[in-house]
C-alpha cells in the first residue's frame, strides 16, 4: 500500500516537473545550462490526462549542473515484463525505454553515456533488452512518437551510437518502470533502469 501511495505521489510530482513554462524552448532545442529546465514536454499525439503510464522525469546532477531524463512509466499489472511471446517487452527487440514518447535525455553539458561522447542537447534513448545485457541506443532525433514502428531508417540514420551494458537484478520487485540516478562522485553517476526484477546501470560522466 505504501509503495502504491509513493508511486502515485511521484507521478504527480513528475508531471509538474515535466511541464515547461510557456516561453520554454521545445525539446531538441536546448544546448546550454537551461536544458534541464525546459525538459519533459509531452508529445501532442496523446493527452497527458488519463494516461495509464504517467509521464515522469529523473534528474542527474553532475558537476553542479542538472541533466534530465523524461519518460513514460508503464506498470507490470500482473504481466510478465521481459521475455518472449506475451511479455510486455520482448527480448532482443528495440524498446522505447518506457511508454508513449521515446525516453528523452536533455543534456546541458558535454558528457559520456556508457562511453558515447555527447554534446549538449537533447537525445532519444532506446534500448534492446537481452537476457544478460542490454544495448543502449542514443539518437539525435527527439520528435518521433515512441512506438518502435516509428523508428524508421531515416531516424536510425541519426543515431549517435549503440553500446552494451550488463543487466542485473533488483533487490525487490519493481511494479512501475523507474529511471533514477545513483551518484558516483561529483562528475559521475549511474542511470538505473529498473522494472520487474531487472536492473540496468548506464554509466554517465561529465566531460570538460
Could you tell me what each predicted segment is?
Residues 1-16:
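Sec-dependent bacterial lipoprotein signal peptides
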Residues 18-21:
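Bacterial signal peptide processing site
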Residues 34-102, 106, 110-113:
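N-terminal secretory signal peptides
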Residues 72-74, 110, 128-132, 141-143, ...:
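Solvent-exposed coil/turn segments that connect beta secondary-structure elements
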Residues 92-148:
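Mid-length scaffold segments of soluble, non-membrane domains
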Residues 143-188:
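Surface-exposed, gly/pro-biased binding rims or lids
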Residues 189-196:
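Short, exposed beta-strand-loop hairpins at the edges of beta-sheets
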